[in-house]
Design a protein with these regions (language model features):
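Short hydrophobic/aromatic beta-strand micro-patches
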Residues: 51-53
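Catalytic core of pol beta-like nucleotidyltransferases
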Residues: 1-30, 38-44, 55-103
């Protein structure tokens, strides 16, 4: 996988263009970006932190891994996929304060 220097606007644009497919195929209600790319602190080896909320009944390992693979291919970068309701309490406030949701 190529490690390209990309920015938050490029990531958001790619996710917005693919948003309908992500929601329909992977049963996602919300998707957003947080972490180093949002803060402008990404390095050449940084992964992209993505926060998701799955539709009820679709939060399973198989769907999670399919979405992770799809996002890594779409964004041409490693993705750290985080399920919103699984965020540890000590990280929740920071993540929710910095997340940029797609549409």
């Amino acid at each position: 996988m190529a490690r390209q220097r990309t920015n938050i606007n490029e990531i958001k644009e790619k996710l917005e263009l693919d948003e309908n497919r992500i929601k329909e195929v992977f049963h996602v209600n919300e998707i957003g970006i947080f972490g180093s790319y949002v803060k402008g602190e990404q390095k050449s080896r940084s992964d992209i932190d993505v926060l998701v909320v799955f539709e009820k009944g679709h939060k399973d390992f198989f769907n999670y891994m399919k979405l992770k693979g799809h996002l890594e291919e779409l964004l041409d970068n490693k993705v750290d996929l985080v399920i919103k309701d699984a965020v540890k309490e000590r990280l929740r406030e920071r993540i929710l304060n910095e997340v940029i949701y797609v549409r």
